[in-house]
């Protein structure tokens, strides 16, 4: 298994399949995506240029309902999802987790944005999307958590660390910092706040 974080929240997990999440600023024409998961409709999470650079004829896109009108202009191979549901598509089974701000206006709960929990090679991954620490997120059990730390639009670094220490995954991977909001070195503060029993890997440096 190989994990890559390109920038912001753009993630690629490679096993026997290539699984992307929120592709953004991907300039190379890979055309290798088997699945693409989109968390919400902001430009740094739904980037059509990046999508076109990774899509192939059989790619399946998984997207919140708010993006259906845009996605269907790119491909017919997509499904729409709602928060707090379970789905299966192809070889993958996954759950959607509500992704929203508690007291900020950027990601209202009523927009029905999502994070994703899915099982890959006997490990449970949680890709949170742009969210604060919510009741729904606190219920998630996972092995690997991609957690936003940049603040402003999401939880800040201390909130993110407290959250990770609470749910205690085996591995935490900080995202959503270093390009739009959050200093590139923010991951260092995050690492210092994490329980030593939890491994941290920072791909954005």
Regions found by a protein language model. Give the residues of each.
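Core dinuclear metal-dependent hydrolase active-site scaffold
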Residues: 1-31, 80-140, 155, 203-205
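Metallo-beta-lactamase
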Residues: 117-170, 174-182
């Amino acid at each position: 298994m190989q994990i890559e974080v390109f920038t912001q929240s753009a993630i690629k997990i490679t096993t026997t399949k290539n699984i992307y999440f929120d592709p953004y600023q991907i300039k190379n024409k890979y055309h290798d995506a088997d699945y693409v998961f989109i968390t919400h409709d902001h430009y740094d999470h739904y980037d059509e240029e990046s999508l076109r650079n990774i899509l192939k004829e059989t790619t399946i896109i998984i997207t919140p309902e708010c993006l259906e009108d845009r996605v269907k202009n790119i491909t017919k191979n997509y499904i729409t999802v709602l928060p707090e549901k379970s789905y299966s598509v192809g070889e993958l089974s996954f759950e959607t987790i509500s992704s929203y701000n508690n007291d900020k206006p950027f990601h209202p709960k009523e927009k029905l944005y999502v994070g994703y929990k899915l099982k890959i090679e006997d490990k449970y991954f949680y890709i949170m999307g742009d969210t604060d620490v919510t009741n729904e997120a606190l219920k998630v059990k996972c092995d690997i958590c991609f957690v936003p730390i940049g603040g402003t639009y999401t939880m800040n670094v201390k909130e993110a660390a407290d959250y990770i220490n609470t749910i205690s995954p085996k591995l935490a991977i900080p995202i959503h910092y270093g390009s739009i909001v959050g200093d590139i070195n923010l991951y260092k503060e995050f690492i210092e706040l994490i329980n030593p029993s939890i491994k941290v890997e920072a791909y954005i440096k």
